[in-house]
Amino acid sequence: MRIALGIEYNGTNYFGWQRQREVKSVQEELEKALSIVANHPVEVQCAGRTDAGVHGTGQVVHFDTNVNRKMVAWTMGANANMPSDIAVRWAKEVPDDFHARFSATARRYRYIIFNHALRPGILNSGVSHYHGELDEKKMHEAGQYLLGENDFSSFRAAHCQSLSPCRNLMHLNVTRHGDYVVIDIKANAFVHHMVRNITGSLIKVGRGEEKPEWIKWLLEAKDRKLAGATAKAEGLYLVDVDYPEEFELPCVPIGPLFLPDNLN
């Protein structure tokens, strides 16, 4: 049988999602815990591989097993055998043609900036910090130039292995919640560092270095060297993954923390 899981994790202490030799990864910790519950080696497939220091509230994985367990065993059992900064949020049996990555129709990320003169203490590893003034309205205006099917070469990491830089960006909203500026972005898929590179460029607009129209020029230039610096990893969250309704996956609050599902 095939089981899908919803996963939440704080990526601070991990070298990214993907299992690697000699370093800690979220995937490795999850697979070890699931293997204990299943009493056989378990290998998971994920919706999206996040980089070192990046967090997730809406990661989705699937794995195959021939053992019969109640769904609560996969949630409670896995959580009992994992570090406290990783948690299974839900479990559901799915058809054999479900695939966490290839069945997904869209991914959604949120980037959180603590916009205050002084750095945060409690949330220091869960948000990015920018001390100067940011105009979130101009950042939002700039972001609208990126909507639709576009070549995102200007926002693509130099070592990105994707065969194509083209992606369909479905929405990009920038909102302020007190001292927190949130960039909410959804696309069918993302090239490597795309969200963080877009964020770095929007910050240049927000602090008045560039006008909103600069983002349109940057997109058309297709040159990573012209864009802003890559924003830090700690502010980024994979918050949601869309799948066809036929799979009937659970809907849970995407967060993180206090943030509602819809930001206006």
Curated annotation (Swiss-Prot):
InterPro entries: PsdUridine_synth_cat_dom_sf, PsdUridine_synth_TruA, PsdUridine_synth_TruA_a/b_dom, PsdUridine_synth_TruA_C, TruA/RsuA/RluB/E/F_N. HAMAP family: TruA (MF_00171). It comes from the Bacteria. NCBIfam families: hisT_truA. Substrate binds at Y109. Signal peptide: none annotated. Formation of pseudouridine at positions 38, 39 and 40 in the anticodon stem and loop of transfer RNAs. The gene is truA. Coiled coil: none annotated. It catalyses: uridine(38/39/40) in tRNA = pseudouridine(38/39/40) in tRNA. Pfam families: PseudoU_synth_1. GO terms for molecular function: RNA binding; tRNA pseudouridine(38-40) synthase activity. Homodimer. Belongs to the tRNA pseudouridine synthase TruA family. The keyword tRNA processing applies. It is an enzyme of class 5 (isomerase). GO terms for biological process: tRNA pseudouridine synthesis. Its EC number is 5.4.99.12. The keyword NADP does not apply. Disulfide bonds: none annotated. It comes from Vibrio parahaemolyticus serotype O3:K6 (strain RIMD 2210633). Keywords: Isomerase, tRNA processing. This is tRNA pseudouridine synthase A. The active site is at D51 (nucleophile).
